[in-house]
Amino acid sequence: MFKKIDHIGLVVSDLEAAKDFFLVLGFTIVKRQLLEGEWLDKVVNLPDAKAEYIALTIPDTQTNLELLKFYTPEGNRDGHISMSNQIGFRHIALEVKDIESVVVDLKKQGITFFSEIQTFNNQKKLCYFLGPEGIILELAEYL
């Protein structure tokens, strides 16, 4: 039935800040485009929809991310701070090699982590950090 997850779409209020954040993580831009028209209104079930999107990928992988900024109708936010235990979509996990060096590099870029690197069942090292728009991300290294 399904072949794979094609991409993850994130709606953001600051498209440039979100793009810059994911570029720091090693994503590259595949495409940037303004979206509008009857086809979009129907797909997203919103009247007079106009949005801009940036398609990103991690080079040499099938990891695809779409950042979307809706200009009309403007999106809203529920105002809650992202917490790991909130119901619904919670985080994006990125597999890395040498998690320690990745954390050091990202800290140099100004990224703040929830905690130091933790080890789960001697199988995986991991840590969480906060991205743009309250998105929680995880770094994971399998042992």
Task: For each feature predicted by the language model, list its residue ranges.
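Active-site-proximal beta-strand elements of phosphoester/diester hydrolases
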Residues: 67-69
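Active-site/binding-pocket entry motifs
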Residues: 62, 71-74
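N-terminal beta-strand motif that seeds the catalytic metal site of vicinal oxygen chelate
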Residues: 1-19, 28-33, 89-94, 143
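Core segments of cupin and vicinal oxygen chelate
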Residues: 11-62, 108, 127
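A short, acidic/glycine-rich surface segment
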Residues: 37-42, 74-80
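A generic structural micro-feature
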Residues: 2, 45-50, 83-86
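Vicinal oxygen chelate
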Residues: 32-34, 52-55, 63-65, 93-143
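Short amphipathic alpha-helical segments
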Residues: 6-8, 52, 85-90, 125
